[in-house]
Amino acid sequence: MSLKKTDQVIDEFSKRLFIVEGEVTDLLTSETMQNLNASMQTATGAIAVGSALVGQIGNAALASFAASDEGIEVSDFAIEITDNCNQKHYFKGCFPVVIFKKGDMVKVIAEPLSGQNKYARAVAVIDQQNNYTWTGQEVVKGRIRYRVFVMKLFGAISIIVVIFALLFDFFITNSIKQMLINNIGIQIISFLFILVFIFIGWRVGASFDGQSIELEAILKKLGFNKPSMASLNDFSVSSVNRKNKINMDEYPDRWEQYTYRLDLAKKYDEEKYGKK
C-alpha cells in the first residue's frame, strides 16, 4: 500500500473513532467468565454477581469470553462507562492485558460497529489519573520508522553479500588489480544490486502498514503531530523503568510490557515534531 493510500485509510478510520470519558461502572473480562464457567455458572450467571453487561451486550457477543484460549495471551472484555451526564456507554474489546477496573476514571476511544447500536468496539483505553494507555495494537516501530528499519536491514544484507563476493573474487584472482570489481560494468551492477535490495526492504516494510493503521488513527485522534513515527513500545512501563534503571534485574511483568505512558509519548511527539 502506498504512503498516500495508507494516509487516506488512516484519516478515514480516525474520523470514525469517537471518545467517551467517564467512570468504569461495570467490567466483565475473559477471566471473570472463565471463573464463572469453572463454578458451573452460565453467562447469565454474571448478572447474579453484579454485572448488567450480559443483559446490555447480549450472551452471543460474550460467548467467546468463557472459552479457553490456551496459548493466546489476550483478554476479551466488556465495559460500561458512565459519563458526567450520567449516561451509560457500552464497549467490547480485546487487549493483551486488562488492568483498568471498576471505579477508574478513563477515556475510551472506540469505533462504531456496523449494524450495532448497543455497544461499540474499544480500540484504546486511557487511565486519566496515571496516563496509562492500553490498546489492542502492539506496534514496536511507527510505520515510517519500520520501513526505514527494514530498508537498512536489507541494505546491510546486500552490502555484506557484495563484500563476501569481493573477498571470494580476491582469493580467486589473488590480485586487487585483476579483481572483477575494477570493471566499471561490475561496479554498476553491484550498485544496482544494493539499490534493488533497499527497494525490496521498503516494500517489505510497507507490507506491515496494516498493523500500524489502527494505532496511527488512535494517535491522530489524540492530536499527535507525527503518528507515523510513533513507537509506543519505547514508552511502555517496562521500557520507562529500564531507562530509569528501575527493576533492572527483574523480567518485566506482562502488564508492564503492554501498558504505555501516554503523557511521555505525547511529550516526545510534541518536542520532536511539534510546531517550533
Predicted regions: what they are:
Residues 87-95, 134-138:
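Short amphipathic beta-strand/extended segments with alternating polar/hydrophobic composition
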Residues 111-151:
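OB-fold/S1-family single-stranded nucleic acid-binding modules
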Residues 140-230:
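Alpha-helical transmembrane spans
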Residues 94-108:
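Short nucleic-acid-contacting surface segments enriched for D/E, G, S/T with interspersed K/R
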Residues 217-276:
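Charged, low-complexity cytosol-facing tails and large interhelical loops of integral membrane proteins
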